[in-house]
A protein has these predicted regions:
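Core segments of cupin and vicinal oxygen chelate
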Residues: 9-48, 54
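Short, charged/polar surface micro-motifs in flexible loops or helix N-caps
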Residues: 44-47, 56-59, 70-75
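Hydrophobic adenine-recognition pocket in adenosine-nucleotide-binding enzymes
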Residues: 8, 65
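A short, sequence-level motif marking secondary-structure junctions
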Residues: 52-57, 126
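Vicinal oxygen chelate
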Residues: 15-16, 66-114, 118, 126-129
Length: 132
């Protein structure tokens, strides 16, 4: 079986601002619009398609998005978090503010986008790298 994750829609209040925030924080580019969507594409070809959610602020279901990054990209991403003065945590429950975690011998950090989605940067997958 060959199954690959292709895309997901990220609900937001302002597609252009939200896509640009993610692109800036991840060191990526916002792609050309596709219908009502503004895509941000990661290295494996998966797109995060930003679309304005109908309704009010309370209507956007927030989600958690984790990105496995290199040590160098973690450093760059963490620097962007600090440059913007964003709050960040070492855990998904926002209990360890101002810390990064060192789970499985790597580093990880959580922060929120303007829509309340939790973004995570981590350098080692949870459970560690599979043994060859």
């Amino acid at each position: 079986v060959s199954i690959h994750f292709n895309h997901t829609i990220v609900a937001c209040h302002d597609a252009a601002a939200s896509a640009q925030f993610w692109a800036d924080m991840l060191g990526l580019e916002v792609g050309p619009p596709y219908g009502p969507f503004l895509p941000v594409t990661v290295d494996n070809g998966v797109t995060f398609d930003f679309a304005v959610a109908p309704g009010t602020v309370q209507d956007i279901p927030t989600a958690h998005y984790a990105f496995l990054v290199s040590e160098e990209d973690f450093d760059k991403g963490f620097a962007r978090i600090q440059e913007r003065g964003l709050r960040y945590w070492a855990d998904p429950h926002a209990q360890r503010e101002g810390e990064i975690n060192h789970n499985d011998g790597g580093r990880g950090v959580y922060f929120f986008d303007p829509n309340g989605h939790a973004l995570e940067l981590l350098t080692v997958p949870y459970g560690g790298w599979p043994e060859s």
